[in-house]
Every structure is written in structure tokens, then in C-alpha cells.
Swiss-Prot record:
Component of the cytosolic iron-sulfur (Fe/S) protein assembly machinery. Required for maturation of extramitochondrial Fe/S proteins. It comes from Drosophila willistoni (Fruit fly). One of its GO terms (biological process) is iron-sulfur cluster assembly. It comes from the Eukaryota. This is Probable cytosolic Fe-S cluster assembly factor GK14772. InterPro entries: Cytosolic_Fe-S_CAF, Fe_hydrogenase, Fe_hydrogenase_lsu_C, Fe_hydrogenase_ssu. Keywords: 4Fe-4S, Iron, Iron-sulfur, Metal-binding. Belongs to the NARF family. [4Fe-4S] cluster 2 binds at residues 188, 244, 396, 400.
Amino acid sequence: MSRFSGALQLTDLDDFITPSQECIKPVTIDKTKSKTGAKITVQEDGYYEESEESGKQKLQKVEITLQDCLACSGCITSAEGVLITQQSQEELLKVLRENQKLKATGDNDLVQTIVFTISMQPILSLAHRYQLSVEETARHLSGYFRNLGADYVLCTKVADDLALIECRQEFVERFRDKEDLTMLSSSCPGWVCYAEKTHGNFILPYIATTRSPQQIMGVLVKHFLAEKFNVPGSRIYHATVMPCYDKKLEASREDFYSEVNGSRDVDCVITSIEVEQMLMEDERSLSQHEPVDLDWPWTDQRPESMIWAHEATMSGGYAEHIFKYAAKELFSEDTDNELKFKQLRNRDFREISLEKDDKTVLKFAIANGFRNIQNLVQKLKRGKGANYHFVEVMACPSGCINGGAQVRPTTGQHVRELTQQLEELYKKLPISQPDNSHTKAIYGDFLDGAHTDKSHDLLHTSYHAVEKLNTALNIKW
């Protein structure tokens, strides 16, 4: 287990963001009048019972929800070991079965519209696992989810594009306002959760307010598509397929609960590993499911392909895209060629600069993995981080392509080797540019234009420092 420093307690945290095995959330115990002679009995099936002279009563089971995880300063990253009842493949399959029954019995007033959104990283992971092309994998996944009961299966392309546009505009506005704070990317929930719980009010002003592609997709599905399909957002069930467990926590944030719809923008998150498990339980390979094209409900004109890559990194391409945009917008410098990032401590910490008139006018960095994040935060605390104007921050080494819930390497294969193979698959994909007719149409048809109050309200969020718990339960002896 890797640790940041002796002053920090990190619960079973290592650089690969595996779920914490211990929960240190204190349970509130209601004090009652002292009683004697009581006996607690545990039955074989796990039933707890307290017996006393006045009779027997079943004891309440301690439950921990995802909201508890977000409000607790104990763990830092994901918490698979707790009772994640609303964010599992079991819950997803239950919802799908119940919806199929409602359709069969004609209870149309209760039937939900089921929408799946698949992120690019799980598509790559499952393509490698089942030895299919990336395009074939996307189509087979679409067919598989439709067979389970999905009405629409989407990719995250349009949300990825909107996230880049919003984030680059936010950076340019901060730069022009002469804010001294380094802007840190916000799409990684593991990083955001760590920042809120460990560094709180110090670090939060640095973080971009742009929502992650998953949560932008949630807004588009529950609001834009709800209007387009004439279906209440409350009757849309939105499931996403993501590369890490922390996306489950992100979807459970109260910031992403819609009072209008009475539901979360993303109802359920499953991961690459969970999709693999579902396929194994069906005893059918992914390739055995009928291929079906992904849906494109956003505009009348369907793009030639919905499987695209972004420049430079497998985590959205924030650093490279925003660097190129800012160089042109702020300094009239064209940087159309592929950028050459300089490796620093390791391959997960890189930087790039723009020089003009013998002066460094832009300096960006990419910091992947908690070791590099810790070094970055310490620089900011010492006042040395201002050298960077923007940093793309991802909790996992190598970024989202190596997410903690991606399909595991085969026996004898090293994680680094698998990651390199996934990177090669990614590099073969066509490059997507966010400025296209589809994003322009969404801004015009749904968001009242770019950089409007509505677009800011729906595509941005806020963060909350989590007060540290003073409990002896998180002390290691």
C-alpha cells in the first residue's frame, strides 16, 4: 500500500484505486434507558434478534449508502465493500426485468424508457477482452443491452465534446480575468472526491466547474431527450457503462439530483468488469449477441461514425485541446501539429509550454495517479504550482484507459502491457473535434446558445469540502 505521508490516513489506498476494504463511518447509536438481562441472538440466516423480559425485537441492520460515502471523510476513493444497492448489475437487471413485465401486462403509465450510455474506455477494454474491433464491440454491446430491454443505446461522444468546449471556455475566462489559480480538470470523480475530503476549501477553487461527460450526458438524457421524446424525465431510467467504480459515487452526488424530475441524472452506473460478469453469467460471448447500431437522437444528420478518439490522452484530451485553443484564442498562435509533452518524474507526469517573445505564456501539465496528484497538491500549497496554468488530473495511472474497473489482465499479463495494448487501439481511431454541427445544434436547440446562463446551470457544478470525522475508528494500531 502506498501512502502520501505519515500525517495522512489513507484507507487501503494504492495507485490503482481498488475499492476500500474497510469502512470507518461511525454509526450513530441512540441511547436508551439502561436495561439488564437482554440477550442478542444471531440466527443461521443472519437474522439479529434481541431478547429481554418485555419480549423480542428484530435489531435494525446497519446500512451504508453511497451518499454516506460522499459525506464521510474516511475513505478517499471508491467503496465497493459497502452496500451499493442502487449501483450494481443486480439492481440494473432487476429494473430491466420489472420494466419488461410492465410492458407485457400493458401498464404503460408505469413503463420507463431505458437509456444506456457507453463510455469509450469500456468499449476498448471489452474489445480487447473479446478480440473484436472497437466498432464491432460497440455494435455488439448495443445489441446486448437492447436484448436486455434498453430502448436506446448511446455513446458519450456529444457529451465529451461539450465538456471540452465548456472547459476550454472556462479556462480562457479565468485567464483573462487574471486569476492566479492554476485550473485543474474536473472530469475524474476519484480526484474530486479526494480533493473534497482531504484538502477541502484550499484546493476546491482550483478545480474547473465543468461537469464530467457522464454527468453532462445525464442532463442531456433526462432533460433534452425527455423534451424531444415527450417523456417525463422521471420516467427515463438512465444507466451508464464506465471504466471506474468512482463513477458510481459521482452519479450519487446530491448536486446531480434533479428536483424537477425527482430522480438522479444517472440512475445506475455499471463498469467494464460488471458487463464482463453479466456476459459470463449468460454463458454467451459478446460476439454471440446480434450487432445493432448505436442510436443518435441528437440531430437529424447521423455522423459517419460515433467511435472517436480525442487528442493526446485516453482521458478526454483536456490538456492538449485546451492548450491548442488557448494558444490560438489568447496569443494567436497556431499549434495544429501533435503536441510534444515533456516527461518529468515519470510517464504519468508530463508538461508542455508555449513560448512567445522569450517568455513562457502558457504552461500545462498532465498528472495521472495519486502519487503525482499528491506532489502537485504539495506544490500548490507551497505556492509553486502557479507555474502551471492548467493541469489535466486523473486518479488512475495512465488515466481512464486504466480505470480501476476495466477488465483485468489475463494470467501472466502485466497491467502496463494491457494498458499499452488499449492505447494502441485508441490511437487507431479517428480524431474528434468538438466544434461540429451536432454540438452547435444542441447549444442552439436546448441550451439557448453557447455560454448562456442555461448552459452554465446545466453543464457546470460545484464542490463541497467534507469535514473530517473525529473518530478513533480510522486509527491504525
